[in-house]
Structure formats: structure tokens, C-alpha cells
Swiss-Prot record:
Heterotetramer of two alpha chains and two epsilon chains in early embryonic hemoglobin Gower-2; two zeta chains and two epsilon chains in early embryonic hemoglobin Gower-1. This is Hemoglobin subunit epsilon. The modification Phosphoserine is found at residues 14, 51. Keywords: Heme, Iron, Metal-binding, Oxygen transport, Phosphoprotein, Transport. Residues 3-147 form the Globin domain. GO terms for molecular function: haptoglobin binding; heme binding; hemoglobin alpha binding; metal ion binding; organic acid binding; oxygen binding; oxygen carrier activity; peroxidase activity. Red blood cells. Gene3D superfamilies: Globins. Heme b binds at residues 64, 93. It comes from Pongo pygmaeus. Pfam families: Globin (PF00042). It comes from the Eukaryota.
Length: 147
């Protein structure tokens, strides 16, 4: 289990309170699909993913990205209990969707980049470290049900 200090929690929640979940979620998932094109195979039903502009403009990518980032909101509310928070999502991604758990790490890293681009000077090394710790812990929690 990962332990977050009061300072780390404050760094994460402070930035999260300023986050536009809809915009950043679509951007994060879109960039994941562009930078790591093999991840597109999990989104066959999303329609046109033929180019970066098609991906970033795709309404299904934006909607699912919002859903993904909303689940990160659950992580922030439950930073001390991530394994339980993500148990059902872990099971879904493992047993039904068969998503390679490495993809959770990739998405987390993309999210950190999105935060850095959106928040500039507010995204200090301490804030980056707290967010990196959170996205890594979420990736571990999502991979928990894998055998």
C-alpha cells in the first residue's frame, strides 16, 4: 500500500480542483492513442482513429477520456484505499477487456505531461512527484486483479 503525506495530498488536490476534467480527459486519452498507437485496438468501436487530428477530435475519445479522468477523481478522494477503489475497474480491464496493465502506466505518464502543460509554473517538482506517485499507485491498483 502506498502512503501519501499530507503535503502530497495537498499538492494533488490543489491542482485537481483547478482541472477541467472534460478537456484534460479527452486530451490525455487522445494523446495516449496517438503516442502509443497499439492502444487503439481497445477502442475499435470509437470510429475514426486514422490520424492524430481524427483521434483528438473524436467525440467518443473525448467522452471516454472524461470518464477516465473522472475515475481519477475517485482516486484523489480515496488516496489511502486505491486497491479497493479500483477493484471493479481492475476486474473489468483484466477479465473482460484484456487490457495490458502496462497501458495504465502509459496513461498515467501521459496525464502527468498534460498536467505539466496545463499548469506550467504551478507544476513544481514537488507537485510532479506527488502526481507521479499517484498515477503509479493507480496503475498498480488497476493491475491488481491480473494473474
Amino acid at each position: 500500500m502506498v502512503h501519501f503525506t499530507a503535503e502530497e495530498k495537498a499538492a494533488v488536490t490543489s491542482l485537481w480542483s483547478k482541472m477541467n476534467v472534460e478537456e484534460a480527459g479527452g486530451e490525455a486519452l487522445g494523446r495516449l492513442l496517438v503516442v502509443y498507437p497499439w492502444t487503439q485496438r481497445f477502442f475499435d468501436s470509437f470510429g475514426n482513429l486514422s490520424s492524430p487530428s481524427a483521434i483528438l477530435g473524436n467525440p467518443k475519445v473525448k467522452a471516454h477520456g472524461k470518464k477516465v479522468l473522472t475515475s481519477f477523481g475517485d482516486a484523489i478522494k480515496n488516496m489511502d484505499n486505491l486497491k479497493t477503489t479500483f477493484a471493479k475497474l481492475s476486474e473489468l480491464h483484466c477479465d473482460k477487456l484484456h487490457v495490458d496493465p502496462e497501458n495504465f502506466k502509459l496513461l498515467g505518464n501521459v496525464m502527468v505531461i498534460i498536467l505539466a502543460t496545463h499548469f506550467g509554473k504551478e507544476f513544481t517538482p514537488e507537485v510532479q512527484a506527488a502526481w507521479q506517485k499517484l498515477v503509479s499507485a493507480v496503475a498498480i491498483a488497476l493491475a491488481h486483479k491480473y494473474h
